[in-house]
Swiss-Prot record:
GO molecular function (one): RNA binding
Similarity remark: Belongs to the SmpB family.
Keyword Repressor listed: no
Keywords (A to Z) from UniProt: Cytoplasm, RNA-binding
Family annotation (InterPro entries): SmpB, SsrA-bd_prot, SsrA-bd_prot_CS
GO terms of biological process kind: trans-translation
Organism superkingdom: Bacteria
One family name in Pfam for this protein: SmpB
Chief localization: cytoplasm
Segments passing through the bilayer: none
Name of the protein described by the UniProt record: SsrA-binding protein
Localization: Cytoplasm
Length: 155
């Protein structure tokens, strides 16, 4: 995560399971009033979200932000596509990399930084099934080692 980040609102844990994250970028979000209120309340889901580049702009799809409870008829659509704010050079770099086979733009987390909602966007390459199994075995081995050390210190 970039330096100086604030409170993490939501994380996409599935992205780290399904993809190798090669690079991360910080992007601003273009939101409506009721959307930022719902995000501050922690009512956002990144599980099935993905980003695409269209006409030189980056858009995030399937990011679910629940409707604001105190909102009225001006409440937002929970699944609308939202624009991400990045520098032109970053967009060009992402566009070139995303055209390569096997690469995707995946939202990793949403956090608040200096009062603004930001998204960590990852340039990711898909994992094969055997890669996922290998990662799970490594994770379990680390847990087992930590458990042994913890038990040894108690004695």
């Amino acid at each position: 995560m970039p330096k100086g980040t604030g409170k993490v609102i939501a994380q996409n844990k599935k992205a780290f399971h399904d993809y190798f994250i090669e690079e991360t970028y910080e992007a601003g979000l273009v939101l409506q009033g009721t959307e930022i209120k719902s995000i501050r309340a922690g009512r956002v889901n990144l599980k099935d979200a993905f980003a695409r580049i269209h006409n030189g702009e980056v858009w995030v799809h399937n990011m679910h932000i629940n409707t604001y409870e105190q909102g009225n008829r001006f409440n937002h659509d929970p699944l609308r596509t939202r624009k991400l704010l990045l520098h032109k050079k970053e967009i060009d770099k992402l566009a070139g990399a995303a055209k390569e086979t096997g690469y995707a733009l995946v939202p990793l987390r949403i956090y608040l930084k200096n009062g603004f909602a930001k998204m960590a966007l990852g340039l990711a390459k898909g994992k094969k099934q055997y890669d996922k199994r290998h990662d799970l075995k490594e994770k379990e081995a680390k847990r087992e080692i930590a458990r042994v050390f913890r038990d040894r210190q108690k004695m």
